[in-house]
């Protein structure tokens, strides 16, 4: 059973109502297949996995009249690969982007008088897929011991390719355009 808040509702209503009255209840389906390959030989270790999946939501009476729509985290393709040799490691990730709510269309609205404003049109729920996420990380683990203590030093670089991996879509009112927000560019670890 899945839930969505009804428009304008909040759980912080002082206990005056049951929380179930503030949400729409619906269903969801998730299908997929995953393949994993693992290799180990002496100092070498490698692992690769691929997932093909589809996740949808439906049956919410107040959301698209119960029609099916993409789940926010419906990522059709996910590929992960890791290779380690002695203390060095490489990790690669490639996956489909999240689904977001976007209003790609606008139209002018007129009121009585001279006031005019622009309205955004949302054609559906989770109607825009964000770009693919691509990341390559490098790392090195150095182990050493002193007389009584074992030490481990880990150094690395996160997102070596400095790929712009957006995770959120928002509307910038100053430029009146949709913008993507990404965190963590190339970063020492």
Predicted features by range, described:
Residues 1, 93-116, 131-135, 141-189:
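C-terminal beta-signal and adjacent terminal beta-strands/loops
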Residues 3, 8, 12, 26, ...:
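Generic, ordered loop/turn and secondary-structure boundary motif
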Residues 23-24, 80, 126, 159-165:
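Asparagine-centered polar/low-complexity signal
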Residues 67-69, 122-128, 177-179:
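Active-site rim elements
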